Amino acid sequence: MQKYDLHLCEIDGGNLHNAIPREAHAVCAVPMKDKESVRVDLNIYLSEVENEFAVTEPNLVMELESESPCAEVMQQDAMKNFLHSIYAVHNGVYAMSQDIPGLVETSSNLASIKQRDGKLVVVTSQRSSILSSRKDMSQMVSSAFLLGGAEVTTGDGYPGWKPNPSSEILQVSVESYKRLFATEPKIKAIHAGLECGLFLEKY
């Protein structure tokens, strides 16, 4: 973006707000004189990214193709603000649980980017077993886009559910399992959006 006179024509990625996006694509325009230089630089970058994530994302595929000329491009200042915000916003694990080793406590997901009625609509989702941490993460994400001049709306979300190894319902479940199967159950926790937080809030 800084080296070339690049213009964003189209971008689309992700679908559901509560799912990690699987694929995305973007169409960009550059002056014809820079076409080959851009191709070389991008291919080098794509190779570096694929090597960086070779272990954690062995099936990662990044492709560069020629496209037909764009009929319209995104306004330059808006494009720069958008790209800076996307680059700045946190995406992925933010904090691990202090109670259960290996359990993600707080995360943020850059779920989707869509073009609707001449606007770019970005959807993110924050999860945490601690409500205050989820709110803090949500505010951090909002700030990244507000600094880029975007309009930000926030949904109600759902309450967190901090694991309690000493809870009565867990002890009852453990004893029932042992009585039925004559063996100790394995107690585990997951990082996901569950109804349990709503139950805990009421009962």
Predicted ranges, named:
Residues 23-25, 127, 139-141, 169, ...:
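General N-terminal targeting signals
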Residues 63-109, 114-117, 131-136, 146, ...:
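An extended, acidic, His-containing surface patch that forms the Zn2+-binding/catalytic region
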